């Protein structure tokens, strides 16, 4: 889904003043990341999109994914976003459980994801 091009262009859409890219460091090692970017072409006004929530295997099970997701949602509030959207897949069970705990709810697709088993979620901020 364009990951290599996105990586080469960092910070890209995740840059300030409308986006954020967070890295979690543990003893100087990058343990995880999460990003937020504006999404102006969705049917939701003043929305942002959470992307690239990832925790390296050695650092999983310590709540780091939750901390990153919560920090991105807090950043969305600071940036004045009304809601945060995301997409995830069937096999990302731990992530889907986390999103549900954070208040995300399933919504109709806000863009075309060619991967089977895609789910589209939204949480209201504020």
How would you label these PLM feature ranges?
Residues 1-51, 56-57, 69-71, 75, ...:
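Acetyl-CoA-dependent GNAT
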Residues 28, 63, 80:
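Conserved G/P- and acidic residue-centered "switch" motifs that form tight phosphate/ATP-binding loops
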Residues 52-53, 61, 97:
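Hydrophobic alpha-helical segments, especially transmembrane helices
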Residues 56-58, 62, 90-91:
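Active-site acidic-Proline motif in GNAT/NAT acetyltransferases
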Residues 62, 66, 70:
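Residues forming the Rossmann-fold NAD(P)(H) cofactor-binding site
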Residues 82-102, 106-126:
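C-terminal "cap" of GNAT-fold acetyltransferases
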